[in-house]
Amino acid sequence: MIPKFRAWDCSSLILMYSPLEVIFGDSDIWIFDEDSEGNEWIVNNNLSLMQSTGLTDKNGNEIFEGDVVKMAKNVYSEPTYYEVVRHRGGAYRLESKQYGCELWLRHTDCEIAGNIYENPELLDVE
């Protein structure tokens, strides 16, 4: 599987979606800018990269690290918001202040509600 990325540009506060080609230099991040007139490689060190988990939510939307998803812990509980994070060992997890689980176990139960950059307020609702 070829890794897919999206990026949050910390300078312009814009989320850049795939297809996003990325090259990691010694101290630089190069991205291929298809939106520019010359379709050129540009250096942007103000990026926060988010890799695709390779999984989709219950609506078929691709889940990236940094997404905020909504999911009920069980059939009796109200939906809660969770951040998608990469944990030690490389596994993707759903994390909230009170609960966490492996993403691969519950990805078909969750729905993408936003991301940590554009919707940080979702994670404060607990």
At which residue positions do the language-model features occur?
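Secondary-structure transition motif
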Residues: 1-126
